[in-house]
Curated annotation (Swiss-Prot):
Pfam families named among the record's database cross-references: dDENN, DENN, uDENN
Name recorded for this polypeptide: DENN domain-containing protein 2A
Residue span of region Disordered: 15-153, 171-334, 434-479, 498-532
Compositionally biased residues, Pro residues: 297-314
Residue stretches making up the cDENN domain: 737-870
Species the sequence originates in: Homo sapiens
InterPro entries, alphabetized: cDENN_dom, dDENN_dom, DENN_C, DENN_domain_containing_2, Tripartite_DENN, uDENN_dom
Magnesium among keywords: no
Residues recorded as bearing Phosphoserine in the entry: 551
Biological function: Guanine nucleotide exchange factor (GEF) which may activate RAB9A and RAB9B. Promotes the exchange of GDP to GTP, converting inactive GDP-bound Rab proteins into their active GTP-bound form. May play a role in late endosomes back to trans-Golgi network/TGN transport.
Residue ranges of every copy of the uDENN domain listed in the record: 566-715
dDENN domain residues: 872-969
Domain of life per record: Eukaryota
Amino acid sequence: MDMFSLDMIISDPAAEASRAGKKQLRGVQNPCPSARARPRHKSLNIKDKISEWEGKKEVPTPAPSRRADGQEDYLPSSTVERRSSDGVRTQVTEAKNGMRPGTESTEKERNKGAVNVGGQDPEPGQDLSQPEREVDPSWGRGREPRLGKLRFQNDPLSVLKQVKKLEQALKDGSAGLDPQLPGTCYSPHCPPDKAEAGSTLPENLGGGSGSEVSQRVHPSDLEGREPTPELVEDRKGSCRRPWDRSLENVYRGSEGSPTKPFINPLPKPRRTFKHAGEGDKDGKPGIGFRKEKRNLPPLPSLPPPPLPSSPPPSSVNRRLWTGRQKSSADHRKSYEFEDLLQSSSESSRVDWYAQTKLGLTRTLSEENVYEDILDPPMKENPYEDIELHGRCLGKKCVLNFPASPTSSIPDTLTKQSLSKPAFFRQNSERRNFKLLDTRKLSRDGTGSPSKISPPSTPSSPDDIFFNLGDPQNGRKKRKIPKLVLRINAIYEVRRGKKRVKRLSQSMESNSGKVTDENSESDSDTEEKLKAHSQRLVNVKSRLKQAPRYPSLARELIEYQERQLFEYFVVVSLHKKQAGAAYVPELTQQFPLKLERSFKFMREAEDQLKAIPQFCFPDAKDWVPVQQFTSETFSFVLTGEDGSRRFGYCRRLLPGGKGKRLPEVYCIVSRLGCFSLFSRILDEVEKRRGISPALVQPLMRSVMEAPFPALGKTILVKNFLPGSGTEVIELCRPLDSRLEHVDFESLFSSLSVRHLVCVFASLLLERRVIFIADKLSILSKCCHAMVALIYPFAWQHTYIPVLPPAMVDIVCSPTPFLIGLLSSSLPLLRELPLEEVLVVDLVNSRFLRQMDDEDSILPRKLQVALEHILEQRNELACEQDEGPLDGRHGPESSPLNEVVSEAFVRFFVEIVGHYSLFLTSGEREERTLQREAFRKAVSSKSLRHFLEVFMETQMFRGFIQERELRRQDAKGLFEVRAQEYLETLPSGEHSGVNKFLKGLGNKMKFLHKK
């Protein structure tokens, strides 16, 4: 039988001993032996001959064998064994003689096949029950004769004798090894596993010797080393029966062998060390492959070993990968790590942490190389105690992490990580890594705990917040318009730097006298002190006489949920008698009935009677005209409780032919928003031109509309004949303080000095009367003066246009701001007036005054304000950026912005530090510490002004509103005040107090010594 081809049968010096003694038996089994095996017969030494003759003495009884033709033939079992042994030994000799190049791992893999060939013996109990007895760390040629002799022994006595010798040799060679319990390779599952694998393989491959095919044919060799059909058929017929029979004997021998209890299995650490180094360096598995793969399908269906470009499968033990390398544990760990990182670098999109979890879930080395690198993602900041070595330059931050996990992994991953910006690399690595222990870092010399601790604050430029009290940071955070910067610079130049002390500093200096370089000691004359005391007395006396009205802003908040307007009226001129003057009368009213209580109805009726007088204060001067350009104006009605209602009027000429008298459409509302109601009046005028009957449906739709919030827009639908249903957009701006305000008319009517005097009189809530010959100029100037006192509100009587019939109101002892036409001036002179400022807008002069208006305001602040107002036109020309904050309406102009910002800065200088002295009480109510607030100002003249100004109703309303307002609600004044506070030095004392505190600190220091 051609069991092996000629090129595979190569003599081996170790096998010569067995061949010399078994010539006859070999001739029976293989009548045509290889010619290349005979010349080596003479090179036998004494040891080999003794082994050969020992084997001849124990020739077992022949075992029946079935031939290819179906007949049984009794062949010695040693013949089958020798045939298989010769085949295997000739292959080993090929590698050793160099006739076919190979590696040491190839030789060891084939020796593994020689061990399993013994499974064909009728009684190979020692061979299959101990399948790895030949596997020894001291594997070499000296062991081969002993192993060959063990294969030939079939007699029980001889086997027992050899087993005892083997036990003695093992005791001598492995005395220092720690005994371990038998592993899975010693359990009874091993022979069935080999039997199953060996019996399945011939069926899949088409037959052949089970010993050779099961060991020689590896998944990596199937392509190049597949047996030919003739050889397969020959092997199928000759070897199937002995294979099955040998398996039965294997199980009987392994169970009932009397020598098994005396066999001490080899220690497991040595076997692990052995098969860890016996794999092929080409990537072929070693001896441990079959042991560790029991749960896998048969060998032909096994997938090839995973390539480095993919993560290793979880079912393959990590020893398969380490078998290629040396037995050193350190080298083994590093190469596994490198292979894994190479796979992650080639597939960079795969998470490195996930790959390590897949491939290295069972690490059997002495120390875990990943324990200081890998960790599940942490919720807290892993960089909390690490210092950044990089510096932030502008918007680019360069961060150096000497302790970065990338420093402990191969270059493939390090270069890939370093290709990204440092900041993004930090954010991406923090999900998968925790930093190395600082003790290990200091041991390696890459860093020390004192140098690796970063701030816990984010390093992104977008996450940087500017602290209060840093002027540069404050200006970086909020873009301040150039106009505001110019105005602030003028104030600083004219009056010097003003220092405001904090709350604690003001409390310390309450009992002391505060003076500094800004104190105006030269102005502290007896006359000025006397005038100051007189003003203080007058303000307090008027405050007792006048009712305390709520502030206008809080009143608007109270009525936000009410209707958009209260009523709409149409006023016309009629003659009661021929030759008499025209009298204004109500011709139309909506709604017809006022749904209010009796008190409000009585007040509303009084107002309805007075509205025609405000719509036509110059009724006696009118005559019928043929053409008239419509005009818009407004007036204000003040109730008994101080509530204020605005009247928005549109005077126009009704439709018709010939000469006609004009009529006025008036909307009365609590909301002070001129642009919104001007839009409604435009729609009224358009529908009035079509038919007067269309006005009432429009006003009904507007009244039913919701009240708009600040900056919001409401939609009103109304039917218009010829156009269908129209949608009217009504927008309420964020800041309506400059609407319907024309500062140009005010400056054209008054000089800067007169304007500042009127402004000072209003701040002390004095009585002021404007005189003008035109209704439009009178109305505009009154509205402009009220707008100048923002963020304060005029709390008293305010009548921009007073009808001549109501001129006696000017005799009231309460503060007021009233506008009169020049035609009412003779009547005014006949009335007994008390402390009132009468301003002639036509001639820009004061008709009556109190002679102290020029000394009310702090001197330096007044000079700075006047300087800005003198340069208003130049500043307005430079202002080409549009509205500063996007809050102003379409009527806003650069001049309006310049004037408004100048007066806002004035109030910031006076009361901009109020927020520092608002403290919360037990019920979370904020209250102003008035005395500390006043004494926080260093300038004496400013403290004197605050002493009087804080007694006014407008200041109390201002503070009351801020105490009740939410802290997050900020208007233009709050924004400018915050900018001002950011420019102040924090905690700086002035004058003597600063010196005394420094002296006290020195005394404490000396006392400690």
